Swiss-Prot record:
<dbReference type="InterPro" id="IPR010985">
    <property type="entry name" value="Ribbon_hlx_hlx"/>
</dbReference>
<dbReference type="InterPro" id="IPR005621">
    <property type="entry name" value="SeqA"/>
</dbReference>
<feature type="region of interest" description="Interaction with DNA">
    <location>
        <begin position="152"/>
        <end position="158"/>
    </location>
</feature>
<feature type="region of interest" description="Interaction with DNA">
    <location>
        <begin position="89"/>
        <end position="90"/>
    </location>
</feature>
<dbReference type="GO" id="GO:0006355">
    <property type="term" value="P:regulation of DNA-templated transcription"/>
</dbReference>
<keyword id="KW-0238">DNA-binding</keyword>
<dbReference type="GO" id="GO:0043565">
    <property type="term" value="F:sequence-specific DNA binding"/>
</dbReference>
<dbReference type="InterPro" id="IPR033761">
    <property type="entry name" value="SeqA_N"/>
</dbReference>
<dbReference type="InterPro" id="IPR013321">
    <property type="entry name" value="Arc_rbn_hlx_hlx"/>
</dbReference>
<feature type="region of interest" description="Interaction with DNA">
    <location>
        <begin position="118"/>
        <end position="122"/>
    </location>
</feature>
<keyword id="KW-0236">DNA replication inhibitor</keyword>
<comment type="similarity">
    <text>Belongs to the SeqA family.</text>
</comment>
<feature type="compositionally biased region" description="Low complexity">
    <location>
        <begin position="50"/>
        <end position="61"/>
    </location>
</feature>
<dbReference type="Pfam" id="PF03925">
    <property type="entry name" value="SeqA"/>
</dbReference>
<dbReference type="GO" id="GO:0032297">
    <property type="term" value="P:negative regulation of DNA-templated DNA replication initiation"/>
</dbReference>
<comment type="subunit">
    <text>Homodimer. Polymerizes to form helical filaments.</text>
</comment>
<keyword id="KW-0963">Cytoplasm</keyword>
Amino acid sequence: MKTIEVDEELYRYIASHTQHIGESASDILRRMLKFTAGQPAAVNDTQPVSAPAPSKAAPSAGNESRPQDRVRAVRELMLSDEYAEQKRAVNRFMLILSTLYRLDTAAFAEATTSLQGRTRIYFAGDEHTLLQSGTHTKPKHVPGTPYWVITNTNTGRKRSMVEHIMLSMQFPSELAEKVCGTI
């Protein structure tokens, strides 16, 4: 077993692709790279990729689930102790974003790319991109995802962002309203 050092952003991106508890980094990378044991290593002269931008064609764990299952998962989040223990709106906001991403990565990616302010970008694949649209944006990494989001917006804007994402992901508007009311 060899050890390599990766930056925090890359580590989080790899970790966001964990499919089950206890899965090793090697297993995750093998799956992501479609590399099997015993396969000869191909050496390519490739340019480094700047940011792990989420792809619209990325397979989505939520695509196979029925819409009722997605709705139930969001309702269960709203009733969970973990959600109830969140004292700050920003923490509830981040928990909701993580859950929506986990339910349907492709739909989440599509929804976030269409979500921008007049002068700001709200979501990006790295902190630097968000800081370029404003130095006081307070970017935070959305746990379990390759995304960063600005967090120095008021609660109303956070609600608006969640509502846009949920409606873009085809959640019932009543559920989106209910979720936004808890932020």
